[in-house]
Amino acid sequence: MVVHGAGWPLSENHASGGAFLYHLEDRQVALGLIVDLNYDNPYLSPFDELQRFKTHPKIAPTLAGAERLSYGARAITKGGLNSLPKMSLPGAFLVGCDAGTLNFSKIKGTHTAMKSGMLAADTIIEVLLEGDPGGKDHTHYDSHMRCSWLYPELKSARNFGPALHKFGPYLGGAFNYVDQNWLRGKLPFTLKDNTVDHNSLNEVDNATPINYPKPDGVLTFDKNSSVFLTNTNHDEDQPVHLHLADADLPLKVNLPRWAEPAQRYCPAGVYEIVNEGLDQRFQINAQNCIHCKTCDIKDPSQNITWVTPEGGGGPSYSNM
């Protein structure tokens, strides 16, 4: 069974995204929720939205009596053609999901990722046959992509995501139906998202707090027990790989303006406000980090930088 969903529970808090449920072998189920990081409510927690999704009457019966086997989270690139970066640099190419070749309108990306890798391989063979010693920026990789079927496929889907963000699920859905099914993505204009994700949060004065129900330990769970299933490990003596440009900013700026959203957008409980009597302290539990990189994207003050930790550290997912 394959289930794709949109709307609830994210729509209740004016957020967008989608959900999936796939039946696997050995009576296993893969379930997940994709949350667009342009949401505006600082009290929203993607992790807790996933827990809510599991309570849907169409989903809960599938999970009845099941055992939670694994958990993970990752920031994904789904902006499509509008968000593709320069895909070549000296000595390397960006391919697949590292570049962002997902066809969002079809919710498919394996074939486009493979094609981008094949084009990169063809480019490498070309330059090796030409006697290239390496280390150059081979920008004609981009030309190869534009001459393949990959570029027109991504171009035909370029308006899908921006239409949903600009017009909402109903008008945006109608727009996309006409664009994708009648016009085959050949509209003479391109919609774009002009607001970066970290600038999308409303301040607390203009936001409604969200009271998530406590997990029942059967169908819904807490972050800590979920992170345990990621088999995450970092050496205790290694430097913290989550850097703050200003250590005072979380309490002085983010807390009063946005209720410090790092406590909620992080799916692993890395960031927390610790109360110590009358004082408060911003704590980074770097050992919990599952390397999703959401903090580097969503922090409204752009105060957090995720850097590569020591080799071997991080999650070790099973069955994912």
Model-inferred region functions:
Residues 4-7, 15-19, 76-83, 205, ...:
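Glycine-rich, charged/polar anion/phosphate-binding loops
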Residues 3-5, 11-75, 111, 130, ...:
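Conserved FAD/dinucleotide-binding core of flavoprotein oxidoreductases
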Residues 134-242, 248-250:
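Mid-to-C-terminal Rossmann-like scaffold of FAD/NAD(P)H-dependent oxidoreductases
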Residues 256-287, 293-318:
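Iron-sulfur cluster-binding cysteine motifs and their immediate structural context
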